[in-house]
């Protein structure tokens, strides 16, 4: 156990450091997401720049790079505390990727993937919370913030032994959304529908 957990933490960080948004944009001939759009190398920004197909590829990859290390460690019998550190390591890799100059995204999809091995019931509730918040508000960032705030309570209800590690993960996501929280408070955050409308007007078919 003592040897497996630190090794899985390193593996999770390296997996997280593979920035799918940057790679997909390069393959599709799109601008670097770190310097275009919102400047965030994540699925939402890629959706704005390259459309649904590219964004879906980024989303799936980002979820998997959080899910696979945690799932593997879970199957190996790693304790909840260490599982939390492994999940955080995957998100830290996404946020500060060693392979891409330590400039990454906000870790939402990767965090979602890291929480998924706890159970499909929890995964469905988390996805529903994010989707409902986005549909009602129009803000992708608010969906992430609300989901991060509620996640520890969901986990406490479904599998309380994972409450502490998920709480640590939620704190990391909220810290990464500090600027978004300020813009939401000042009513300066742009709705996702507005961003897509601007893209269609700029690049008409």
Swiss-Prot record:
In the bilayer, the protein is annotated as: Multi-pass membrane protein
Tell me the Gene Ontology biological-process terms attached to this UniProt entry. Answer: phospholipid biosynthetic process
> Any ranges marked Cytoplasmic in the topology annotation, and which?
25-52, 102-111, 159-205
Q: What EC numbers are recorded for this enzyme?
A: 2.3.1.15, 2.3.1.n5
Q: Does Membrane count among this protein's keywords?
A: yes
Q: Which reaction does it catalyse?
A: sn-glycerol 3-phosphate + an acyl-CoA = a 1-acyl-sn-glycero-3-phosphate + CoA; a fatty acyl-[ACP] + sn-glycerol 3-phosphate = a 1-acyl-sn-glycero-3-phosphate + holo-[ACP]
Q: Name one GO molecular function term.
A: acyl-phosphate glycerol-3-phosphate acyltransferase activity
- The enzyme's main class, written as a single word, is transferase
Q: Which residues cross the membrane?
A: 4-24, 53-73, 81-101, 112-132, 138-158
Q: Which pathway is it part of? A: Lipid metabolism; phospholipid metabolism
InterPro entries attached here? G3P_acylTferase_PlsY (IPR003811)
Which SMART domains does the record cross-reference, listed alphabetically? G3P_acyltransf
Where is the protein localized?
Answer: Cell inner membrane
User: What keywords sit in the KW lines?
Assistant: Cell inner membrane, Cell membrane, Lipid biosynthesis, Lipid metabolism, Membrane, Phospholipid biosynthesis, Phospholipid metabolism, Transferase, Transmembrane, Transmembrane helix
Example GO CC term: the record gives: plasma membrane
Under the heading PANTHER family, the entry gives:
GLYCEROL-3-PHOSPHATE ACYLTRANSFERASE-RELATED, INNER MEMBRANE PROTEIN YGIH
Oligomer and partners: Probably interacts with PlsX.
Q: What does this protein do?
A: Catalyzes the transfer of an acyl group from acyl-ACP to glycerol-3-phosphate (G3P) to form lysophosphatidic acid (LPA). This enzyme can also utilize acyl-CoA as fatty acyl donor, but not acyl-PO(4).
Homology family: Belongs to the PlsY family.
User: What is this protein's name?
Assistant: Glycerol-3-phosphate acyltransferase
Which source organism? Escherichia fergusonii (strain ATCC 35469 / DSM 13698 / CCUG 18766 / IAM 14443 / JCM 21226 / LMG 7866 / NBRC 102419 / NCTC 12128 / CDC 0568-73)
């Amino acid at each position: 156990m003592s040897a497996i957990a630190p090794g899985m933490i390193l593996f999770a960080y390296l997996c997280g450091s593979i920035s799918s948004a940057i790679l997909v944009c390069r393959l599709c001939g799109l601008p670097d997401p770190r310097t275009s759009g919102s400047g965030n190398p994540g699925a939402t920004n890629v959706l704005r720049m390259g459309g649904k197909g590219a964004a879906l590829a980024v989303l799936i990859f980002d979820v998997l790079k959080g899910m696979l290390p945690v799932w593997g460690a879970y199957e190996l019998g790693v304790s909840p505390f260490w599982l939390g550190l492994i999940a955080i390591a995957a998100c830290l890799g996404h946020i500060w990727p060693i392979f891409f100059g330590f400039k990454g995204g906000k870790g939402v999809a990767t965090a979602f993937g890291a929480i998924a091995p706890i159970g499909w019931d929890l995964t469905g509730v988390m996805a529903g919370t994010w989707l409902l918040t986005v549909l009602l508000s129009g803000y992708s960032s608010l969906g992430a913030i609300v989901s991060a705030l509620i996640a520890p309570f969901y986990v406490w209800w479904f599998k309380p032994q994972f409450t502490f590690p998920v709480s640590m993960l939620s704190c990391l996501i909220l810290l990464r959304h500090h600027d978004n929280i300020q813009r939401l408070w000042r009513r300066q955050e742009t709705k996702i529908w507005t961003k897509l409308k601007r893209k269609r007007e700029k690049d008409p078919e």
